[in-house]
Swiss-Prot record:
GO terms for cellular component: monoatomic ion channel complex. The L-type calcium channel is composed of five subunits: alpha-1, alpha-2/delta, beta and gamma. Keywords: Calcium, Calcium channel, Calcium transport, Ion channel, Ion transport, Membrane, Transmembrane, Transmembrane helix, Transport, Voltage-gated channel. Belongs to the PMP-22/EMP/MP20 family. CACNG subfamily. It comes from the Eukaryota. It is a multi-pass membrane protein. GO terms for molecular function: calcium channel activity; voltage-gated monoatomic ion channel activity. This is Voltage-dependent calcium channel gamma-like subunit.
Amino acid sequence: MTAIGAQAYKLLGPKRPHRSFFESFIRTLIIVCTALAVVLSSVSICDGHWLLVEDRLFGLWYFCTISNHSEPHCLRDLSQAQVPGVAVGMGLARSVAAMAVVAAIFGLELLIVSQVCEDVRSRSKWAIGSYLLLVAFILSSGGLLTFIILLKNQITLMGFTLMFWCEFTASFLFFLNATSGLHINSLTRSPPAGTLAYRKQGYDGTSLI
């Protein structure tokens, strides 16, 4: 390609979309909050201790009993908790919650790539990433609801541990970032190519400029 041809391609080829400072700030804030939600959810699931009821500690991975002057005695066999269906149900809850983190990580990656490598597909990547965050919210909420339903007879509001509230906060952030990402993508949608040309002409075909 000659120098003139290369210059013409730069002038006529697709240009990177220009974004305002406010839009860039909002998109960066969504990415940062999503990363925070991924960290909160990951820590919460790895720890897994979500409910403390008197001397019993219920979690995704362990069931623990606590005495006054000794360390917690934890068992991997969740059936020892003597709660119907808790062994199978906790397996489902932690699997769904872990899948939520995976979906959120992929969504976060697409959000970052759409901002770092801006091209004509950046908006599509951002939209897909936002939808993945919505999937992460649904899965994370499913894990929380499964845990609550399994232990509905033992639950007290003050019994929920910090790790449970971390997962709850992460689930809320997944939803907030997903809806915010889709909303800002729709607000900043560029008009079709023919729209601007149509606006420059009158109804009789004469140019307005």
